[in-house]
Each structure stands twice: as structure tokens, then as C-alpha cells.
Amino acid sequence: MADQTVHLALPYLAPSQAQKHVTYNEALRRLDGLVQLAVEAASATTPPGAPAEGARYLLGASPTGAWAGQAGALAVFADGSWWFATPEVGWLAYDKATETVLVLKAAGWTGV
């Protein structure tokens, strides 16, 4: 059996697992970052100097700094650090900067 869900990479609890709260809290943290996706900006390449807790960005082709090596990812700032998720074709996101709804197609993010 896999140790996480297929689409959102939510961790499963293992039988007889110690400290189940850690795994459960990680799943809640991921859900909070991935569900009802509204991003500060799409195609972002430079992390903000002082991101707000919960800030989310769709990353562009050549991100720098803390985002280096995460091209095309979703960056989420939570609990004082960045974590990243790989969006799947069909995901929707609202871009706050342009007030546009986006859909991820095979060719990339595009306005709806």
C-alpha cells in the first residue's frame, strides 16, 4: 500500500503508527494549501521578502532563492517556511494579481 494519496500527496496513517497527530497535522496543512486555490501571483520567480502566512504562488520557469529548482510548482508559505506541490492538469487557481481564473492544461496555465 502506498504511504500517501495519489493526487494531493496526503499522508496515510500507518497501522500501529506512533505520533499519529504528526501525520494528521501534515495532511491538514497540505489540504489548507491546496484546496480553494487562490494565488498571490502566477509565473512568479522571486520569493517575497516577508511572505504572509498561507501565501501561495504559482512558480514560473526559472525561480530563484528559496524557490530555486521548483519551476512550475505551487509554493506555499506555512509555519515559517516554503513547501511545494506539483499541480496536475485540470487544476483551477484564482490569480489575485490579475483577478483571473486559471486552468492548468498540458501546455501550462491559461485563463478560463
For each feature predicted by the language model, list its residue ranges.
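Extracellular "spike/adhesin" assembly and maturation modules
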Residues: M1-P63, A75, D79, P87-V112
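Short loop/beta submotifs within extracellular cysteine-rich repeat domains
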Residues: G65-A66, W82
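Short glycine/proline-enriched turns and hinge-like loops at secondary-structure junctions
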Residues: W67-A71
